């Protein structure tokens, strides 16, 4: 047990999201949600993030967000081959059925670098170093979250500071690459989880 906090590690594709889970969710979660909003006179057009937990009794919905998941999008979007602008325009125009979403045949893992003490009490305004290490590194990404530009440098400004994403041919390789890339960034109170995502090594 612990305090509720934002996601610290995420990966794509998920070996736990099986065809059976997908079929169940499409029938009883995704479509039901959209149909219910339309029936209430509030048809939804946009992004819905479904926060799911897999249980012995099947998938359970923990939360909805009317946006991409953070940091979930940081492993999904880098693998998407489509132009995201075209996808969003199709969404706005009601023509998503004409879009064939395609994803790279690889994997991506994102490790969140947090401020030590998060989600309770943590220091802000600490200089962050190492962004130059990501230059010209294909398949590696550094996504900003709790940061700001102050006095000519980038400093921490939140609990979840950066999302470090890396690709790999497999989830195991992507996880290894992502954790290696976390060492490229340094700030005084940097903290990250090492135990989350280990299940993908055996998946």
Each model region followed by its residue ranges:
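A non-catalytic, amphipathic alpha-helix used as a structural packing/dimerization or gating element
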Residues: 24-32, 173-180
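Generic C-terminus detector
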Residues: 147-151, 155-203
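Structural motif
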Residues: 59-60, 108-111, 139-141, 153, ...
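Short beta-strand elements
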Residues: 1-3, 50-54, 59-68, 146-147
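Glycine-rich phosphate-binding loop of ATP-grasp-fold ATP-dependent ligases
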Residues: 1-21, 71-76
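A generic structural motif
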Residues: 16-18, 68, 72, 165-171
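Active-site "cap" helix and flanking loop/linker of ATP-utilizing ligase/carboxylase catalytic domains
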Residues: 26-48, 65-137, 150
């Amino acid at each position: 047990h612990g305090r509720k906090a934002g996601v610290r590690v995420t990966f794509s594709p998920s070996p736990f999201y099986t065809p059976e889970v997908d079929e169940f969710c499409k029938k009883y979660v995704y479509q039901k949600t959209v149909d219910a909003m339309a029936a209430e006179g509030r048809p939804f057009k946009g992004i819905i993030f479904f926060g799911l937990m897999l249980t012995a009794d099947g998938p359970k919905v923990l939360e909805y967000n009317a946006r991409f998941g953070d940091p979930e999008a940081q492993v999904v979007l880098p693998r998407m081959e489509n132009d995201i602008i075209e996808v969003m325009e199709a969404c706005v125009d009601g023509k998503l059925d004409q879009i064939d979403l395609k994803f790279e045949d690889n994997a991506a893992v994102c490790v969140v670098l947090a401020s030590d003490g998060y989600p309770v009490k943590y220091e802000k305004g600490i200089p962050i170093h190492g962004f130059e290490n990501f230059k010209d590194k294909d398949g590696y990404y550094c996504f900003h979250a709790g940061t700001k530009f102050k006095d000519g440098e980038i400093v921490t400004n939140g609990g979840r500071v950066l999302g470090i994403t890396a690709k790999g041919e497999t989830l195991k390789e992507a996880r290894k690459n992502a954790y290696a890339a976390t060492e490229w960034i340094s700030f005084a109170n940097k903290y990250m989880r090492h135990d989350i995502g280990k299940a993908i090594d055996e998946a």
